[in-house]
Amino acid sequence: MSYEKLLERFLTYVKINTRSNPNSTQTPTTQSQVDFALTVLKPEMEAIGLKDVHYLPSNGYLVGTLPATSDRLRHKIGFISHMDTADFNAENITPQIVDYKGGDIELGDSGYILSPKDFPNLNNYHGQTLITTDGKTLLGADDKSGIAEIMTAMEYLASHPEIEHCEIRVGFGPDEEIGIGADKFDVKDFDVDFAYTVDGGPLGELQYETFSAAGLELTFEGRNVHPGTAKNQMINALQLAMDFHSQLPENERPEQTDGYQGFYHLYDLSGTVDQAKSSYIIRDFEEVDFLKRKHLAQDIADNMNEALQSERVKVKLYDQYYNMKKVIEKDMTPINIAKEVMEELDIKPIIEPIRGGTDGSKISFMGIPTPNLFAGGENMHGRFEFVSLQTMEKAVDVILGIVAKD
C-alpha cells in the first residue's frame, strides 16, 4: 500500500543529526536525541492519536499507546526503533531521491558513486524509488526508516478506527548504535506480551538470533629503557600486544567469517614501549562457543604473564549481550505471526541470524521477547547507505498485519 506521509516523515527525521556519543555518560548520550524525542516525535505521536505519550528521562525512551479496537485480539504488542545514528558524519544530511532504472548513482557532488559493481544489492531495486545520501554523510535509515514506518502505521490505524487491532505500545529509544540503548529499558512501563524492533535491513528480514557478545580490554605494561642498552632489560608493551594478537586464530576475524561463524575483532590499538592498550569485541552464536572464545583470550593472557613472571597483561573481559534465540524459541508466537503476515503479503521471510545485536537482544532477556523486523536500510553506517520507499511501505503493511492477528 502507498502511504502519503511516509516519505515526507522519513526525510524530516533523517535531516536531524541524532548521532550518539560513546564517550558520554549521559542518558541519552547526546542532547539532540532528547530534542528529537520531545520536539519532533512526541508532538507527532499526540497529533496522530496515540495515548499516554510520555518521555522517560531515566532511560531516554519515548513511549505511547494505541488502544485496542477489538476485545477479540488479546495480545499487547510493542514496536521499537532507535533514534540515534551510527558513528559516521551526520551533520547536514541531504538525501537524494532517485527513481532507479539501473546503473551507477552519483552521490551529489562528492565524487562518490553508488554502483552495482561494488554493491550488487542495488540490482534488486530496479524500478523503485531509492533515497540515498549525497556522499558526505550517512543517511540514517538505520533506524529512522523504522521510526517512520511505525509512526505511519499508527497514524493509519488511528485514522481508520473500523480496523480491528490489539493494544499497541510504541517505543523510540536512544543509543542503540553504541550498544547501551536498552540497558535501562523499563519492561514494567512498556507492558506488552511481546514486541518487535523495526531495525532490520532488506525486504523480508525476520530475525530472532543474534550474536552473544563480549568486550575485551587489555593493558600491556612494558619496561622502557634506552634501546642501546636494552638487552635483557626492555619489555616492549607494543610487542606484547602483538604477541597476544598473534595467538588468536588468524582465520576467526570479521573479514574472514560469515553465517554462524564467530570472531575476535581488534578495533583499537594504541600505546608506547612503556604501556599499550588493545580493545576487542568477541562474538559467537552458541553459548559453548562463546565461552570457549572468552576462555581462550584469558588463557593467552595468563600464559603470557606466567612466561613473563609478572602480571604485565591485565584483562578486562565483560559480557555485553546474549543471543536472544534462547528466550524466543521458548514461544515462537511473534515469529509465527510475522511469518504468516509476510507470506500473506507475498513477502518471502528471510530468517537468518543477525551478525550483530539489537535492542531486542537485551529486552528479550528482560522478559519481553523481541525479534527484529526489516526496515529497509541497505549499506548502513556510511555514505553508501540507501533505502527503498517501496520496502518501507511494505514494512508498514507488515506492522498493520501483525496487530490484526489473534
Swiss-Prot record:
Main location as per UniProt: cytoplasm
Q: Which UniProt keywords apply?
A: Aminopeptidase, Cytoplasm, Hydrolase, Metal-binding, Metalloprotease, Protease, Zinc
Q: Which Pfam family, an example, fits this chain?
A: Peptidase_M20
Write out the annotated subcellular location. Cytoplasm
Q: Does the keyword Metal-binding apply?
A: yes
Q: What is this protein called?
A: Peptidase T
| Annotated GO MF terms | metallopeptidase activity; tripeptide aminopeptidase activity; zinc ion binding
List the HAMAP family hit by this protein, alphabetically.
Answer: Aminopeptidase_M20 (MF_00550)
Source organism of the structure? Streptococcus agalactiae serotype V (strain ATCC BAA-611 / 2603 V/R)
Q: Which reaction does it catalyse?
A: Release of the N-terminal residue from a tripeptide
**List of residues binding Zn(2+) 2:** D142, E177, H381
Question: What cofactor does this protein call for?
Answer: Zn(2+)
- The answer on whether this UniProt entry bears the keyword Transmembrane helix reads no
Which residue positions are annotated as catalytic? D84, E176
Cofactor: how and how many bound:
Binds 2 Zn(2+) ions per subunit.
Organism lineage string: Bacteria, Bacillati, Bacillota, Bacilli, Lactobacillales
Which parts of the sequence bind Zn(2+) 1?
H82, D142, D199
Output the CDD domains linked to this UniProt entry: M20_peptT
Briefly, what is this protein's role?
Cleaves the N-terminal amino acid of tripeptides.
